[in-house]
Regions:
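Conserved catalytic-core segment of nucleotide-activated headgroup transferases in glycan assembly
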Residues: 20-24, 31, 37, 153-155, ...
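Short alpha-helical segment that forms part of, or immediately flanks, the ligand-binding pocket
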Residues: 221, 245-250, 264
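Acidic donor-binding loop of glycosyltransferase active sites
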Residues: 225-240, 253
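Short beta-strand->alpha-helix junction loop in the catalytic core
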Residues: 109-111, 147-158, 200-202
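Helix-loop-beta element that forms the nucleotide-linked donor phosphate-binding surface
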Residues: 132-151
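Extended catalytic core of nucleotide-activated donor transferases of GT-like folds
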Residues: 5, 43-136
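A charged, aromatic-enriched C-terminal amphipathic alpha-helix characteristic of glycosyltransferases
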Residues: 26, 284-289, 296-328
Length: 332
């Protein structure tokens, strides 16, 4: 089977060299890792970005390409399956070029529904029950499903040798004002120490008990490991299922998530207060009891086991198996 993943645009907001890797084992992109995890020996796969010029053959059956312009590109690679990561109109010319391929769309965030210009998908993946319900109402003839967003398992795992220097990990770019900095920094109690991994917000200062800096994605796990637990507080109108949820669970950190975040709640959060399985992962809370929940998690760290839950329910292997089964059942 031939797989094609449309990955998006070569980064415009940072150095494109940050996503250049010589070995697939070093690649920090979860979507490249997911595609690679789906492959059998007899399969072939390509991953495309637009807005660049690069070809990297990672293995005998997996190639990454940066293509200057999708609209004018004529491919000799004929995909049986096309996975669209992101809901970009730039993909439409590629999708129309291969009318018989099985087309999967995972837009997420604001782009969670197909946009005008192309609707002929065979499967639409969603982050949350709310998004799935709307999608089924708008596109009742297209199969749609909830989907787990894993972490790059080649990088995100516990580092027990690293000392815990902070109570809380808050991985969120301050340049994106929907990530929750205003709420977190304006209400953070003084007894907690917090590490913010991301660009500093420009519109206000962070408290004295906050340390903030940006690291490359490949370096994040070792900085996450400096913390005892994690928090997520994004704006639900813009983002959905932030990747840091799976990444912190994969690193073994229990999490507290604001209840406005759009994600598959029952899949990621197994509460210690009301457990659904033997491995608790964290708590889903309102703004009113957010910091009370943080204190509760810190007081009960040894009762959570997010790493084991992640391996059994959220890993790359689980996500890849899910997609292969969907493809087999629905079409190819």
């Amino acid at each position: 089977m031939n797989f094609l993943m449309l990955r998006g645009q070569v980064p415009q907001d940072r150095d494109p060299q940050e996503i250049v890797f010589d070995k697939i084992e070093d690649c920090d992109d979860v979507w490249a890792q997911l595609l690679f995890s789906m492959l059998k020996k007899e399969d072939q796969a390509e991953l495309w970005y637009w807005g660049g010029n690069r070809e990297k053959k990672f293995t005998f059956n997996f190639t990454e390409r940066w293509i200057p312009n999708f609209q004018t590109y004529k491919s000799v690679f004929i995909p049986d399956v096309i996975f669209c990561r992101g809901g970009f109109k730039e993909y439409h010319s590629v999708l129309k070029q291969f009318p018989t391929s099985f087309k999967i769309r995972y837009g997420a965030g604001r782009r969670y529904l197909p946009c005008q210009g192309f609707y002929d998908y065979d499967l639409i993946l969603q982050d949350s029950i709310e998004q799935l319900k709307i999608c089924k109402q708008r596109f009742p003839r297209i199969p749609s499903s909830l989907f787990i967003k894993p972490a790059p398992d080649n990088l995100f795992y516990p580092y027990p040798e690293i000392k815990k220097e902070y109570d809380i990990c808050f991985p969120a770019n301050g340049s994106q004002n929907f990530k929750g900095h205003a709420f977190v920094y304006n209400t953070l109690p003084p007894q907690f120490t917090l590490l913010n991994l991301g660009n500093n917000p420009h519109n206000f200062k962070y408290p004295n008990n906050v340390t903030s800096y940006r690291v490359l994605k490949s370096e994040m796990p070792k900085h996450i490991a400096k913390c005892k637990m994690g928090i997520i507080a994004v704006d639900s109108e813009i983002d959905s299922c932030p990747r840091v949820i799976a990444e912190m669970l994969a690193c073994g950190l229990p999490i507290v998530v604001l209840d406005t975040v759009r994600f598959w709640r029952d899949k990621y959060i197994n509460s210690l207060v009301n457990p659904k399985s033997r491995w608790a992962t964290g708590e889903l809370v309102t703004k009113d009891n957010f910091w009370t929940a943080v204190q509760y998690v810190l007081d009960n760290l040894n009762k959570y086991n997010p790493r084991e839950y992640y391996k059994e329910n959220l890993s790359l292997e689980i996500a890849a198996k899910f997609l292969r089964e969907k493809i087999n059942v629905l079409g190819v």
